[in-house]
Amino acid sequence: MAASWRLHCNQPLLRYLLGFSSRRSLGLAQGAAAWPVDRGASWRWFHSTQLLQADPIKVLMPSLSPTMEQGNIVKWLRKEGEAVSAGDSLCEIETDKAVVTLDANDDGILAKIVVEEGAKNIQLGSLIALMVEEGEDWKQVEIPKDVSAPPPVSKPPAPTQPSPQPQIPCPARKEHKGTARFRLSPAARNILEKHSLDASQGTATGPRGIFTKEDALKLVELKQMGKITESRPASAPPPSLSASVPPQATAGPSYPRPMTPPVSIPGQPNAAGTFTEIPASNIRRVIAKRLTESKSTVPHAYATADCDLGAVLKVRRDLVKDDIKVSVNDFIIRAAAVTLKQMPGVNVTWDGEGPKQLPSVDISVAVATDKGLITPIIKDAAAKGIQEIADSVKVLSKKARDGKLMPEEYQGGSFSISNLGMFGIDEFAAVINPPQACILAVGRFRPVLKLTEDEEGNPQLQQHQLITVTMSSDSRVVDDELATRFLETFKANLENPMRLG
């Protein structure tokens, strides 16, 4: 095929052939200034290998949460050359909060996967794939030259042979004839070593054959009288060391104590003192960063109260009879939402400059996942009933554990609740999740005997089901007096479920 052709045509026809009716420019100038020729002019143009190759559509690493700085490519859901429509899923991206599906914004063909699945720490805005429009030759797409090479997919490090560790020999023992027949007291041992004497030169007079301090002093007197001589072992040349060893490590007493084993080289298998580095996921790094910032910058104050669940448990049993299944935690969420509606001064956040009053009560509920703790949000919880809250918690908890939460389902919130009661914890204090001002930590409910009065005023013992709740509050926004009144109101609402209607 010839490399070029000569085409004679008029201006409107040439515009049509060159595709200026499409949405993409082919690299030629547009407008009247670009067409300074009249009818019948002669044009030279190249065939499709040069002219019809349009710029590809770039797929960039998106920002899927306010705190996201990097992302990991978990899995590509489409293959190169596969047609996609707007809204189709392209890949799964692990953010600092969850695993989110990235959807296509345009119709076209996935032409080039730039960043392979499994790649980690991809910066926001980095090129991860290229697409072309339908009908274009996707095989001809090349990665732009200004794009840096994608980071390599992290692979587990190959096992390496441990480097030989310098062997530190134990101090040489002095040989003492018959030492095995004697059990030396500590004082006797020191005296014998100091005067270079051997216990076999004397007689043990202590209980159970122990060579005592007095026995050692008798040997010293005999030595001074010249009746016995020093007992020194023949000196042996010091062993050669492959590495420099401190002098104190080569010299020791005649009766050495066990030496502390040296710390081994990190990564050396099956050696004392070794450790294994655990790769931190994006979620774990963000959790560590935010909790550290919270404890170091937010002045935490704590208030604790015991709540009687007797009435709640009775209502719950009545609901079960009507096949309505709700948990104690659902009642706690509802009670917190009602209390926040009654006391809007607690439904605030701190943005660094001052408090912000929030119009909606959005409660973040802590959910434990394999990758860490995440807090999906019950939006406008004060306007929802118990059963509606229970349904929302079930759906969001499942999505959180499956890593399918959307960013809007865990970003924001005005108040947090963390419940460890199912793990048998009586009470604990939780760390505030900035910019929120408070978090409520809930323990397990437990039976407690309390002395009460019957209708006639007679004292009697009754069993009560109590839970302990501890509220951590930001003292910059919620002072101790306000936190105390909030807990009092919360306790009253929870112990009287009729108030939660």
Curated annotation (Swiss-Prot):
User: Where Phosphoserine occurs along the chain?
Assistant: S196
Whichever gene encodes this chain, its name is Pdhx
Transit peptide where, by residue? 1-53
**Organism, as annotated:** Mus musculus
Location of N6-succinyllysine modifications: K394
Q: Which Pfam families match?
A: 2-oxoacid_dh, Biotin_lipoyl, E3_binding
Q: N6-lipoyllysine: which positions carry it?
A: K97
Q: What PROSITE patterns does UniProt report for this protein, alphabetically? A: BIOTINYL_LIPOYL, LIPOYL, PSBD
Which family does the record assign? Belongs to the 2-oxoacid dehydrogenase family.
The protein's PTM annotation reads: Delipoylated at Lys-97 by SIRT4, delipoylation decreases the PHD complex activity.
Q: Does the keyword Acetylation apply?
A: yes
Keyword terms of this UniProt record: Acetylation, Lipoyl, Mitochondrion, Phosphoprotein, Transit peptide
Name any GO cellular component annotation. Answer: acetyltransferase complex
Q: What's a single GO BP term from this record?
A: pyruvate decarboxylation to acetyl-CoA
Domain Lipoyl-binding per the UniProt entry, residue ranges: 56-132
Q: Where is it localised?
A: Mitochondrion matrix
Subunit structure, as described in the record: Part of the inner core of the multimeric pyruvate dehydrogenase complex that is composed of about 48 DLAT and 12 PDHX molecules. This core binds multiple copies of pyruvate dehydrogenase (subunits PDH1A and PDHB, E1), dihydrolipoamide acetyltransferase (DLAT, E2) and lipoamide dehydrogenase (DLD, E3). Interacts with SIRT4. Interacts with DLD.
What name does the UniProt record give this protein? Answer: Pyruvate dehydrogenase protein X component, mitochondrial
Query: What Gene3D superfamilies does this protein's entry cite?
Result: 2.40.50.100, Chloramphenicol acetyltransferase-like domain (3.30.559.10), E3-binding domain (4.10.320.10)
Skewed-composition ranges (Pro residues): 149-169
Whether Mitochondrion counts among this entry's keywords is yes
Q: List residues of the Peripheral subunit-binding (PSBD) domain.
A: 183-220
Q: Name one GO molecular function term.
A: pyruvate dehydrogenase (NAD+) activity
Function (record text): Required for anchoring dihydrolipoamide dehydrogenase (E3) to the dihydrolipoamide transacetylase (E2) core of the pyruvate dehydrogenase complexes of eukaryotes. This specific binding is essential for a functional PDH complex.
Q: Where is this region: Disordered?
A: 145-176, 228-256
List every position bearing N6-acetyllysine.
K194
